[in-house]
């Protein structure tokens, strides 16, 4: 939905530019990352059916008329159990605190469950403009949607309510227009052609992690991470990427490798295809699997993911 023509940092003579930060808050798998990708028009945040796949703040940028909107995709809000969980939830609330507008995303198909109620309860004291976004509405009957919207607005005074399908784009254009009209006047934060503040090597690692989760959603626990250890632009215009999938135990390494390396090969093929499409370059990807015991307690790993290490 990048429909703008204004230069970054300036204003046209006819139209004053606008810009602002919009945080997306919701329970795991509410569809936050899918919505970010839909509004931006390309992938900047990974999407899987496995919950809690977004770990750090991911900023996607789109332009609507004279407005530049910076979307902050946060980790899902849930009750943390592990150190990594605590870091993710803290990061999510930190992203919301600095935003101009907060989109509260609720999975309409899941209904008014415990996660939705806890999320709404936590939003009562938030001062920023709050917008309720009911997602996956194409899977829910209209009377149920109306009841859900009424209950949510009864708990929290939302400025607006939108009913959308982030997956197929239904309702997203109206949401984009509203955000463009609601962010403050001011110069753009980023160049016109920039769609994310995430370095490409980090996005490439996130894409590989997505393919890892999609392939091994039943078998692989969350104790895994992917790091891009080498990125080389070659003279022929191609890119050589070396990445490592880190797991905590030898048994997990065997799962990721698969029989005769077939599983990691399939993960690499899927990741390479998508990275190549985004870069519009030939990609030579070399994927390794290594054991790094207790990486979930290593402060350096948290810094690499953009998370504060909780003590």
Swiss-Prot record:
Binding of GTP, residues: 26-33, 73-77, 135-138
A GO-annotated cellular component: cytosol
Domain of life, per lineage: Bacteria
Region (G1): 26-33
UniProt-annotated stretches for the region G2: 52-56
Gene Ontology terms describing biological process: ribosomal small subunit assembly
Keyword Cell inner membrane: yes
Location relative to the cell: Cytoplasm; Cell inner membrane
Similarity comment: family membership: Belongs to the TRAFAC class TrmE-Era-EngA-EngB-Septin-like GTPase superfamily. Era GTPase family.
Name of the protein this chain belongs to: GTPase Era
Gene that produces this protein: era
């Amino acid at each position: 939905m990048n429909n703008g023509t204004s230069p970054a940092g300036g204003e046209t003579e006819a139209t004053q530019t606008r810009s602002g930060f919009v945080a997306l808050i919701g329970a795991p798998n509410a569809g936050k990352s899918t919505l970010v990708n839909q509004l931006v028009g390309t992938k900047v945040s990974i999407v899987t059916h496995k919950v809690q796949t977004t770990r750090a703040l991911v900023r996607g940028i789109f332009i609507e008329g004279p407005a530049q909107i910076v979307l902050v995709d946060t980790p899902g809000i849930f009750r943390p159990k592990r150190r990594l969980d605590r870091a993710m939830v803290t990061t999510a609330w930190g992203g919301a605190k600095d935003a101009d507008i907060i989109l509260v995303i609720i999975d309409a198909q899941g209904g008014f469950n415990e996660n939705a109620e806890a999320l709404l309860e936590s939003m009562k004291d938030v001062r920023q403009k709050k917008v309720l976004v009911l997602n996956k509405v194409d899977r829910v009957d209209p009377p149920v949607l109306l009841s859900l919207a009424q209950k949510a607005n009864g708990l929290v005074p939302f400025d607006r309510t939108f009913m959308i399908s982030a997956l197929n784009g239904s309702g997203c254009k109206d949401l984009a227009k509203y955000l463009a009209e609601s962010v403050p006047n001011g110069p753009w934060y980023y160049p016109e052609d920039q769609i994310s503040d995430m370095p490409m090597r980090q996005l490439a690692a996130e894409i590989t992690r997505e393919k890892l989760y999609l392939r091994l959603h039943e078998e692989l626990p969350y104790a895994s991470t992917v790091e891009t250890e080498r990125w080389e632009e070659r003279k022929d215009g191609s890119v050589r990427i070396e990445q490592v999938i880190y797991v905590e135990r030898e048994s997990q390494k065997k799962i990721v490798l698969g029989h005769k390396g077939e599983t990691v090969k399939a993960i690499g093929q899927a990741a390479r295809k998508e990275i190549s499409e985004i870069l519009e370059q030939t990609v030579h990807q070399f994927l390794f699997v290594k054991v790094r015991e207790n990486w979930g307690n290593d402060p350096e790993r948290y810094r690499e993911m953009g998370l504060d290490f909780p003590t």
